């Protein structure tokens, strides 16, 4: 974080600060909020982007692993949004990015990652709720739903072998996705799915029977869902 902060300062000639926090810790959202308040930061944009995946079958995971996972990908999203919404209401302006996934539209993968897709579906619905309740007051939430994106996510989650099976035409670079996501958020879009193929897949997931979607996903992902 220190290196990235210094790089941003140098490249863009702006002030950039940071705080290290473990969102698996229930006190982290409060700590982040207090850090911003103590530094008199007026938060106009909130990006809920923390995430990872558990590379185990559901029966192999411990309850503590699942609780931490759900806290980072779900509870912390709600808690941080809850903390910063009041000041956005005072400003009558605010942008919130919910970094979700194309997996939020599809059935969970067979045996693996049984919680990832479902929690991302929750994030989408939560983003929808923010829009329904606060768009008229100047606050918008954008559900960003990327497909396979080249980042350190899969390596960190012990899933790089699975990622390597995915055809190159289905992968997008992280910079392209990040730029598109920010543009969509600033425009106040409710949902943004990068790329024509991913948009088609999201559409098909909503209209095709679940059994067909599972087979289609497995085929396109090089057996990742088998």
Where are the model-predicted features located?
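C-terminal helical subdomain
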Residues: 143, 164-201
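Active-site-adjacent segment of SDR/Rossmann-fold oxidoreductases
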Residues: 11, 106, 128-140
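Residue(s) in the substrate-gating loop at a strand-loop-helix junction
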Residues: 101
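Rossmann-fold cofactor-recognition segment
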Residues: 10-26
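Active-site helix of classical SDR
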Residues: 81, 119
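Conserved NAD(P)H cofactor-binding loop of Rossmann-fold oxidoreductase domains
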Residues: 49-54
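Substrate-binding pocket helix/loop in short-chain dehydrogenase/reductase
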Residues: 57-59, 65-69
């Amino acid at each position: 974080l220190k290196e990235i902060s210094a790089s941003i300062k140098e490249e863009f000639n702006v002030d950039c600060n940071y705080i290290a926090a473990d969102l698996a810790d229930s006190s982290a959202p409060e700590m982040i909020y207090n850090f911003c308040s103590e530094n008199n930061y007026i938060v106009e944009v909130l990006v809920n982007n923390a995430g990872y995946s558990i590379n185990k079958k559901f029966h192999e995971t411990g309850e503590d692993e699942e609780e931490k996972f759900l806290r980072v990908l779900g509870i912390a999203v709600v808690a941080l949004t809850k903390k910063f919404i009041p000041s956005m209401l005072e400003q009558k302006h605010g942008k919130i990015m919910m970094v979700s996934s194309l997996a939020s539209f599809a059935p969970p993968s067979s045996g693996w990652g049984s919680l990832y897709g479902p929690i991302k579906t929750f994030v989408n619905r939560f983003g929808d709720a923010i829009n329904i309740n606060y768009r008229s007051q100047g606050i918008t939430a954008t559900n960003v739903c990327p497909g396979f994106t080249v980042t350190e996510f899969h390596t960190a989650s012990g899933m790089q072998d699975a990622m390597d099976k995915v055809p190159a035409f289905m992968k997008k670079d992280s910079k392209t996705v990040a730029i598109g996501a920010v543009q969509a958020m600033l425009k106040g879009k409710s949902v943004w799915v990068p790329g024509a193929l991913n948009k088609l897949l999201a559409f098909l997931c909503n209209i095709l029977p679940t059994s067909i979607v599972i087979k289609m996903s497995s085929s396109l992902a090089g057996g990742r869902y088998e």
